[in-house]
Amino acid sequence: IRIGSFQRLFYHDDTDGIDMLARHVARHYYADTNGGAVVNADAETADLLVDLLQAIAGRIAITAGNWMAAGFVHGVLNTDNFNVTGESFDYGPWRFLPKFDPGLTAAYFDQTGRYAYGRQPDAAMWAVCRLADCFVKLVPKSTLEDCLHGFYATLESALAKAVQRRLGIAFDNADEERDAMLARQLFTAAKASDHGFDQIFHDLFGGKARSAGYDDDMWVPLLDILSGAHLVRPNALQHPHFNETEAVSLTIDEVEALWAPIAAADDWQPLVEKITAIRTMRAALDGAAI
């Protein structure tokens, strides 16, 4: 069920249909595993739509924040590319960043950079606003606007958490300003650097530079913040994955190189090896032993 599913009903002025679909979404996608309703499917229509909008917006904000931390470019982000659970899906010509580049696009037809990596937070917010539009005949506009005030804060919080997760670190105390600054300083340094985006996380895993190339002044603010962090799992760096010099990545050049032997000779071995490397990285990040 996509944001576009609600837009279709709104286009046809089907407020009963919007109410019915909203209750279906609340009942089947927003009830927790213990049976307690996250969004009450039996609430009055206005209350239901407000709660549902906040819930969907929150999940989409978290997904968009995770995209940014992963260096992921979805490719096409119209309202049919966002679903009501906030799950990442319906990929077009996706990409992962080779190097940090806010202007990187994935779709050949995206001549203006509408869906560029750095514009994904705004594209996500735009989609959520279009969902709010669908409810304007049932909920006061000002109330709907209030529901979305926390969108960017939620996204930035998710981004900050995902950056720390990729680095395998944590801090002893909660500090949202510090966490946001860490992500900001990492992106600032990455933009000025020649290092690959995935390589940076690999090299700085654990909060310290584990290879050369991080002595320039541009890394100092980031490393200063990281100096106050600790490994989430003290033995994490003992995993064989972190003995590798090169980070595991999946840029478009790598994808095409993996596809070439398949197309030419039905040779799947390079793809099998890449999948194995990705699974090994996942095990390392999750703390599993090899």
Stretches found by the model and what they are:
Residues 1-74, 85-173:
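ATP-dependent phospho-/nucleotidyl transfer catalytic cores
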Residues 79-80, 84:
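Catalytic-loop Lys-Pro-X-Asn motif of eukaryotic-like protein kinases
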Residues 111-290:
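Regulatory N- and C-terminal appendages and interdomain linkers associated
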